[in-house]
Amino acid sequence: MAQVSINNDYSEWDLSTDAGERARLLQSPCVDTAPKSEWEASPGGLDRGTTSTLGAIFIVVNACLGAGLLNFPAAFSTAGGVAAGIALQMGMLVFIISGLVILAYCSQASNERTYQEVVWAVCGKLTGVLCEVAIAVYTFGTCIAFLIIIGDQQDKIIAVMAKEPEGASGPWYTDRKFTISLTAFLFILPLSIPREIGFQKYASFLSVVGTWYVTAIVIIKYIWPDKEMTPGNILTRPASWMAVFNAMPTICFGFQCHVSSVPVFNSMQQPEVKTWGGVVTAAMVIALAVYMGTGICGFLTFGAAVDPDVLLSYPSEDMAVAVARAFIILSVLTSYPILHFCGRAVVEGLWLRYQGVPVEEDVGRERRRRVLQTLVWFLLTLLLALFIPDIGKVISVIGGLAACFIFVFPGLCLIQAKLSEMEEVKPASWWVLVSYGVLLVTLGAFIFGQTTANAIFVDLLA
């Protein structure tokens, strides 16, 4: 039997576990975040042995479904129609599931409980730092997308309340920049400053209800469309093979639950790779059904004229859609602080490690540093959200990073784990797994490079 030796030189990867804000980074919003001592004792936390198989499926589905749902009809349009969109998602699903299984295997081998800790342990210091930077940038970009979504939905709701026609200019207090800023300062900033997050369970509930309600509305509106809604051109084939790849960021952003998955795996009553394979397969099939239902019906309802945020394509006066907009706003208001908390914890760990200051010796300045980090993060995301026109442009950038979490880092972990096995004669399965790891890294690097370059030179500079 192969012996696995996972980079056990702890001096090389000095981990930051607590900077006054213990965070199991990017875990599912259903999980309470608490200091380490509370984490291990809390009955509501993700303690090892407390989560059933069915519960794990729910948590993974919840972590997967989110704001990216609104962009899926536009992704089908970008990909070139229903057939291309379905084929792309089905092909991606194999790699998405395998990446989740690889992370569970490496977590078990390295005895680490979070995504970035697994990467640190298996791949070493440099890759670990790159992973943490990627998580920080990804959460930062997602926070920008959340603020844009708030503005999109508020515009439609305010238009109905003020009884203004579509596109008409209203009073200054209905201006998009003012309403986003007011909402952010009144609700998001106060929720982002605290050291701990105790409202994650409510965010989880709102997220689940909002996601399923949006999907139901999109499907119902396709089956029984309003008379005034006429679809644009219904594409049946992609304009080019590059057009198909331009839909990749949305799919990667939508299905990226890999960073959240490692704590969930370690929380299971039976944290076994085989059991986990069944969990993630079931969860991804459920998520696929939701994304496909929204993507197909939203695209067929509006065709090529669909907005990057599908809810913007519906009339402002539609009350059923207005309820969906309200759900999305409430969900985003509670989800932003959670994503910010995760990004802040990563930045904190990187900063303390760079300074060479042990966490225990720097607790005294934690509050001042936390408030400063929160204000800088909040103001930068707000400023960018005010001037970026739609979520499609943000997703096109951070979707490339999501590809790294799905493909690149799991692929590197698989390669390093297999290379660490001490066997004189390598069996065929060893070569197959190493080759598959190389394929994952290559494919992920290509998607990241292509989508990021396209986002910069086509979307952002257009």
Swiss-Prot record:
Keywords: Amino-acid transport, Cell projection, Ion transport, Lysosome, Membrane, Phosphoprotein, Sodium, Sodium transport, Transmembrane, Transmembrane helix, Transport. The lineage of its organism: Eukaryota, Metazoa, Chordata, Craniata, Vertebrata. One of its GO terms (cellular component) is neuronal cell body. This is Sodium-coupled neutral amino acid transporter 7. One of its GO terms (molecular function) is L-asparagine transmembrane transporter activity. Belongs to the amino acid/polyamine transporter 2 family. It is found in: Lysosome membrane; Cell projection, Axon. It comes from Homo sapiens (Human). It is a multi-pass membrane protein.
